Regions:
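Short glycine-rich phosphate-binding loop at a beta-alpha junction
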Residues: 2-10, 141-152, 334-346
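Glycine-rich phosphate-binding loop and adjoining helix at the ATP-binding site
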Residues: 11-50, 106-129, 142-147, 153-216, ...
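A short acidic Gly-Thr/Ser loop motif
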Residues: 9-10, 68-70, 76-82, 219-224, ...
């Protein structure tokens, strides 16, 4: 992500890109997204006449994560339909003597239609207080040392910039005033370190902790595509890994995303809507299920797959081919990648194995240099507890 792009190259090319990334250009959506929405600056494309005029590269080491911390911490994960919270101690999920977590719970909520930011604040504080109560029940003298959180959306320096959880807070001026600083306000209320990161990156961190290794690209195929990455040092890079809106298909006739109006983006190829798009092409008719009921349509395909239906298998094989080529494409940008963590409803059941087998087949034939990549699926325990517990490792104290 960034609001300023500096290019040393032909002036005509830079002028052309400048016109594309303007309020009236063909990339107006991106110009607004990366400019005012994300970085609160106007997006600029700048020409560097000579190599000496180029700024020094700042790829950087990313943002370190300490995995060997001591004391009590709280980790949370905010989704569209539930809030997860976990208690962690001395670098890992805190367990009772019987091996069960001290606290690792899901609490239902419906934040998107809410128009009062106090509602969001209170509901997040509620789960943090529940976690503190669980800690105090074990050790009345204990002190929460830090809080880490993960949430869908774009966050810059702890401020909310783009997040569907707060879509009810409008117009934009009110969003910037009330929603943007919500996590900074929660941190002030607790008076201890609090760090929030994108949920895709925290998913990759959870995978890295489970695998005890770095260089993990996490991909979740659900209602959309979520992505995240931790490098070989297990650092979160601070990149905008919004792979749902990054193109994987450059065919001009590729499916168009309804939000960004871009074509060929990951959300249309690795999600429930990708399955729904392939259903008629596979020759499957579902007159009893509305066309936009993607979860129900996916469930029907999963049932057909379990019953041995060859048409359903074709859908998963097709997504597997997409996936094989896209993995190779992603590996041009994410370096190194030793593990790819795959999760989400689309890869649940027999069909998920077909997707992975087909993807590996594509990689074997087309990209043998990537054969050593390990595809990893988290187990049920990690899915339930891993994300919130990993989030607890985010703050550096």
């Amino acid at each position: 992500g960034g609001w300023k792009v500096t290019i040393h190259g032909p002036l005509e090319l830079v002028r052309y890109l400048e016109s594309c990334y303007s309020v009236t250009g063909q990339r107006a959506f991106d110009a607004e997204f990366w400019g005012d929405q994300t970085y609160e600056r106007e997006m600029r494309i700048i020409h560097a006449p000579t190599p000496a005029d180029m700024p020094v590269a700042a790829d950087g080491a990313g943002s370190a994560v300490a995995l060997d911390w001591k004391g009590w911490r709280i980790g949370f994960d905010l989704g569209a339909s539930d809030r997860k919270v976990a208690v962690a101690k001395d670098g890992k999920l805190a367990l009772r003597p019987d091996g069960e977590p001290v606290l690792s719970e899901e609490y239902v909520w419906d934040p998107r239609p809410q128009t009062n930011i106090q509602w969001h604040f209170d509901h997040i504080m509620e789960i943090l207080k529940e976690a503190e109560k669980a800690i105090k029940a074990i050790d009345p003298n204990a002190r929460v040392e830090a809080i880490g959180g993960s949430s869908a959306g774009v966050y810059v320096n702890g401020r909310v910039r783009v997040a569907s959880l707060f879509r009810g807070i409008t117009p934009r001026e009110r969003f910037d005033r009330e929603a943007a600083p919500i996590f900074q306000n929660i941190q002030k209320a607790w008076g201890i370190p609090l760090r929030l990161e994108n949920d895709g990156d925290v998913t990759a961190l959870a995978g890295s902790i489970a695998l005890n290794d770095g260089a993990v690209l996490g991909l979740a195929m659900g209602s959309s595509l979520a992505g995240g990455y931790v490098d070989e040092h297990r650092a979160i890079k601070g990149w905008m890994n919004e792979l749902a809106f990054a193109p994987v298909d450059y065919n001009p006739r590729a499916a168009v995303d309804e939000w960004s109006r871009d074509f060929g983006v990951g959300a249309n190829y690795f999600s429930q809507q990708a399955v729904a798009r392939l259903i008629p092409l596979a020759g499957i008719d579902m007159p009893d299920i509305p066309a936009d009921a993607f979860p129900l349509r996916l469930k029907r395909v999963q049932d057909l797959m379990a019953a041995g239906d060859a048409r359903a298998r074709k859908i998963y094989e097709t997504i597997g081919v997409y996936f094989g080529y896209s993995v190779a494409h992603y590996c041009d940008f994410y370096k190194p990648v030793r593990h790819i963590e795959v999760l989400g409803r689309v890869v649940t059941g027999e069909g998920g194995q077909v997707i992975l087998d087909k993807a590996k087949d594509v990689i074997r034939r087309e990209f043998p240099e990537l054969l050593n990549i390990n595809f990893y699926e988290p187990d049920e325990r990690e899915k339930r507890h891993g994300q919130a517990a990993a989030a607890a490792s985010l703050p550096l104290t």
